[in-house]
Amino acid sequence: MNAPHTATLAAETITTLVKKRWGGDFVLLAAMWGSSFLLMHISTVEFGPLPTAAMRVGIAAVFLFPLVWLNGLFPDLKKHWRKTFVVGILNSGIPFVCIGFALLSISTGFSAILNATVPMFGALIAWLWLKDKPSASRLLGLLVGFIGVAMLAWRAAGPGATLKASASGAAPIWALLACLLACLCYAMAASYTKRYLSGIPPLVTAAGSQMGAMLGLALPAAVLWPTRMPSGTAWLAVIGVGVLCSGLAYIVFFRLIENAGPARALSVTFLVPVFALFYGAVYLGEAVTPWMLICAAVIVCGTALSTGLLKIWR
């Protein structure tokens, strides 16, 4: 299978996915979250991990709150604030800080690859907590997706790789563990949302979670605020990640959980590395090799199986 063929297969699979009732949200969310690694890297270098995370959720909260008010959803937000606070800590507060710390040592592409372990955590938690037992085809999809991610990770960390985890080519263990902790928190938040916030408007969950995370991070971020004023580029990056990757993206994410379930919603992270690698090539000059395209096709096939788009066994 040559690179052009795999690229065509990936494009066709994504196009088919978009035609699903929730497929458009699935691909859109992957594209938005794929850009978050690039934007967080730019902002974290100057703001620091914790202030960047606080700014991200704070900007998202400021963006979302007027929408809640204009849509007459403030009573719902007030009623469910405790539950959305928990979601905010699990789905934004802890993960954003962990990823910010990791991005100081590993590349954006490598961190996005690690982020693709979320569906594995999500399927396990949904199975144990929500009794959402995956079918054989969906289990195969998780395995195929994991293989695609492993292929990318092997090439990224191996000798002569274009995506180095650090200047020495070795990813610090704490950075890897931080990313995995973030993935575990994402998975827990998705199942918590499905169990306790089903039927709640996605805008309410998105706004409440970002406000909760903002409250949790505000004080430590103020203590660790940089003494030197960050550049305009860093400010634009943190505003972009707040509005696009948190404000708008979480509306799409919670709507996807409602329509497709937490396990399928979390499978979006199989596509995130594909977009992250694309953005890295365009904006950071990282090479996109035929091997990356082959891995992308494997990941997309895994996504199609794990979300039920393709079914091998009933």
Locate each region found by the language model.
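Specific transmembrane alpha-helical segments of multi-pass solute transporters/efflux pumps
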Residues: 31-40, 65-115, 151, 242-260
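Helix-helix packing/entry segments at the starts of transmembrane helices
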Residues: 53-55, 92, 96, 109-117, ...
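Juxtamembrane helix-entry segments on the extracytoplasmic side of multipass membrane proteins
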Residues: 18-22, 46-50, 54, 76-82, ...
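Transmembrane alpha-helices of multi-pass small-molecule transport proteins
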Residues: 2-9, 21, 46-94, 121, ...
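Hydrophobic transmembrane alpha-helices of multi-pass small-molecule transport proteins
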Residues: 64, 125, 134-159, 163, ...
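Hydrophobic/aromatic residues within transmembrane alpha-helices
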Residues: 43, 52, 56, 102, ...
